[in-house]
Protein backbone atom coordinates (compact mmCIF):
# COMPACT_ATOMS: atom_id res chain seq x y z
CA UNK A 1 0.00 0.00 0.00
CA UNK A 2 1.45 3.38 -0.98
CA UNK A 3 1.62 6.40 1.33
CA UNK A 4 -1.49 8.07 -0.10
CA UNK A 5 -3.54 4.92 0.38
CA UNK A 6 -2.29 4.61 3.96
CA UNK A 7 -3.31 8.19 4.71
CA UNK A 8 -6.72 7.65 3.12
CA UNK A 9 -7.21 4.45 5.12
CA UNK A 10 -6.27 6.25 8.35
CA UNK A 11 -8.75 9.05 7.63
CA UNK A 12 -11.56 6.63 6.82
CA UNK A 13 -10.86 4.39 9.81
CA UNK A 14 -10.55 7.15 12.42
CA UNK A 15 -13.69 7.48 14.52
CA UNK A 16 -14.45 9.79 17.42
CA UNK A 17 -14.52 6.84 19.81
CA UNK A 18 -10.95 5.86 18.86
CA UNK A 19 -9.47 9.29 19.54
CA UNK A 20 -7.85 9.59 23.00
CA UNK A 21 -9.82 11.79 25.41
CA UNK A 22 -6.75 13.99 25.96
CA UNK A 23 -6.64 14.67 22.21
CA UNK A 24 -10.34 15.60 22.22
CA UNK A 25 -9.87 17.99 25.14
CA UNK A 26 -6.86 19.56 23.45
CA UNK A 27 -8.85 19.84 20.21
CA UNK A 28 -11.66 21.68 21.99
CA UNK A 29 -9.18 24.24 23.27
CA UNK A 30 -7.60 24.60 19.82
CA UNK A 31 -11.01 25.07 18.18
CA UNK A 32 -12.03 27.81 20.63
CA UNK A 33 -8.64 29.47 20.25
CA UNK A 34 -8.79 29.37 16.45
CA UNK A 35 -12.33 30.74 16.31
CA UNK A 36 -11.39 33.59 18.65
CA UNK A 37 -8.31 34.42 16.62
CA UNK A 38 -10.36 34.25 13.39
CA UNK A 39 -12.98 36.60 14.84
CA UNK A 40 -10.30 39.11 15.82
CA UNK A 41 -8.52 38.60 12.49
CA UNK A 42 -11.74 39.16 10.54
CA UNK A 43 -11.27 42.91 11.15
CA UNK A 44 -7.87 42.94 9.43
CA UNK A 45 -7.61 44.30 5.87
CA UNK A 46 -6.57 41.01 4.22
CA UNK A 47 -9.49 39.19 5.83
CA UNK A 48 -11.92 41.93 4.78
CA UNK A 49 -10.73 41.63 1.17
CA UNK A 50 -11.27 37.86 1.19
CA UNK A 51 -14.66 38.28 2.84
CA UNK A 52 -15.68 40.76 0.16
CA UNK A 53 -14.70 38.24 -2.53
CA UNK A 54 -16.85 35.65 -0.73
CA UNK A 55 -19.74 38.13 -0.53
CA UNK A 56 -19.58 38.89 -4.26
CA UNK A 57 -19.75 35.24 -5.26
CA UNK A 58 -23.22 34.25 -6.40
CA UNK A 59 -23.30 31.12 -4.27
CA UNK A 60 -25.44 29.12 -1.93
CA UNK A 61 -25.32 30.39 1.63
CA UNK A 62 -23.69 27.24 3.01
CA UNK A 63 -21.31 28.48 5.68
CA UNK A 64 -20.68 31.48 7.92
CA UNK A 65 -17.98 33.98 7.08
CA UNK A 66 -16.70 34.73 10.59
CA UNK A 67 -17.19 38.28 11.84
CA UNK A 68 -18.77 39.51 8.62
CA UNK A 69 -22.49 38.88 9.16
CA UNK A 70 -23.15 36.78 6.08
CA UNK A 71 -22.83 33.28 4.68
CA UNK A 72 -21.26 32.12 1.41
CA UNK A 73 -20.28 28.87 -0.25
CA UNK A 74 -18.34 26.46 1.93
CA UNK A 75 -15.31 27.02 -0.30
CA UNK A 76 -15.37 30.81 -0.04
CA UNK A 77 -16.16 30.73 3.70
CA UNK A 78 -13.22 28.40 4.32
CA UNK A 79 -10.94 30.70 2.31
CA UNK A 80 -12.10 33.89 4.06
CA UNK A 81 -12.06 32.29 7.51
CA UNK A 82 -8.64 30.74 6.92
CA UNK A 83 -7.29 34.15 5.99
CA UNK A 84 -8.88 35.65 9.11
CA UNK A 85 -7.41 32.88 11.29
CA UNK A 86 -3.91 33.69 10.01
CA UNK A 87 -4.31 37.48 9.73
CA UNK A 88 -2.90 38.44 13.12
CA UNK A 89 -0.39 35.59 13.31
CA UNK A 90 -1.72 34.49 16.71
CA UNK A 91 -2.42 30.91 15.71
CA UNK A 92 -0.46 28.35 17.68
CA UNK A 93 2.53 26.75 16.05
CA UNK A 94 4.72 23.72 16.46
CA UNK A 95 8.38 23.65 15.49
CA UNK A 96 8.03 20.82 13.00
CA UNK A 97 4.35 21.13 12.10
CA UNK A 98 4.00 24.85 11.52
CA UNK A 99 0.51 26.19 12.17
CA UNK A 100 -1.90 23.36 11.31
CA UNK A 101 -5.00 24.56 13.16
CA UNK A 102 -5.64 27.76 11.21
CA UNK A 103 -5.89 25.97 7.84
CA UNK A 104 -7.76 22.93 9.20
CA UNK A 105 -10.47 24.53 11.35
CA UNK A 106 -11.89 26.93 8.72
CA UNK A 107 -12.17 24.09 6.20
CA UNK A 108 -13.68 21.68 8.73
CA UNK A 109 -16.18 24.25 10.01
CA UNK A 110 -17.26 25.45 6.56
CA UNK A 111 -17.76 21.96 5.20
CA UNK A 112 -19.25 20.77 8.48
CA UNK A 113 -21.73 23.64 8.56
CA UNK A 114 -22.76 23.04 4.95
CA UNK A 115 -23.33 19.33 5.64
CA UNK A 116 -24.94 19.73 9.06
CA UNK A 117 -22.12 17.98 10.93
CA UNK A 118 -22.32 17.45 14.68
CA UNK A 119 -19.79 18.78 17.16
CA UNK A 120 -18.36 15.28 17.51
CA UNK A 121 -17.91 15.05 13.75
CA UNK A 122 -16.17 18.44 13.72
CA UNK A 123 -13.77 17.32 16.47
CA UNK A 124 -13.19 14.00 14.69
CA UNK A 125 -12.37 15.77 11.43
CA UNK A 126 -10.10 18.32 13.12
CA UNK A 127 -8.12 15.78 15.15
CA UNK A 128 -7.78 13.53 12.11
CA UNK A 129 -6.56 16.44 9.98
CA UNK A 130 -4.13 17.48 12.70
CA UNK A 131 -2.76 13.93 12.97
CA UNK A 132 -2.35 13.63 9.20
CA UNK A 133 -0.56 16.98 9.10
CA UNK A 134 1.82 15.91 11.85
CA UNK A 135 2.57 12.51 10.36
CA UNK A 136 3.13 13.84 6.84
CA UNK A 137 5.44 16.57 8.12
CA UNK A 138 7.42 14.05 10.17
CA UNK A 139 7.65 11.80 7.12
CA UNK A 140 8.82 14.71 4.95
CA UNK A 141 11.42 15.74 7.54
CA UNK A 142 12.85 12.22 7.61
CA UNK A 143 13.04 12.17 3.82
CA UNK A 144 15.01 15.40 3.80
CA UNK A 145 17.46 14.30 6.49
Q: What is the role of each PLM region?
A:
Residues 1-145:
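N-terminal core-entry segment
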